[in-house]
C-alpha cells in the first residue's frame, strides 16, 4: 500500500489530507494517479519515503577516503551483508555525531536498497503527476519531523511501531545518535490480549537498555 499525506506548512492547519491506498501492486500506480488528480495535487512537490522492508540500515566505520568517495567505499565495505549484488545496490550514508562514538572514531549509518526499487518509486511518483524532490528513509524523516515538533537540545526519543516490529530512534540537536531495532515483537492484537503485559515489560527493558547506552556509553546523559 501507499500512505498519501498532503501537508501545507504555510497553513494554520498544515495536515490537509491523509489516506492509505490499498490495492494490488499492479493497480497502485493508477490509484495514486487518480487520487492526485481528485485532490488537485498535480505538480505539487513530493517527498517519497521508502518502506522499512525496502532498505537496510547499518552502523559502519567511516572509511579513510575523500568525501566524494565515501558512499562507494562504504558500499564495498558492507558488500557481504547486502541482499543484492554490488551492481544492483544503491547506498547512501549519513554521519553520526562524533560525540556518540568517541572510542571507535568516526561512524556512519549506511542505507542500502535495490536500484530497481528506487526506479520504481521514482516512476510511481512522476507518473502520478507529482514533482519528486527526494526519496528518503523513515529515520531521516522522523528526525526532521521530530526537530520541528519539539525542542531536542536535551535529546528526543521516537518509538516507531509497525508490522510487528519496533525501532527506537534517539536524537539530539537534529542528529541521529542511535537507531536500534528492539528485540521485541509487537502486534496490535497483542495489546488487547493477555500476553500484552509480558510483551510490554520486555519492551520497557529494551527501552531502558537503549537509554542507558545513550546516557552512559555515548555520554549524553
Residue ranges and their predicted role:
Residues 1-221:
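Hydrophobic/aromatic-enriched cytosolic interaction surfaces used to assemble or bind macromolecules
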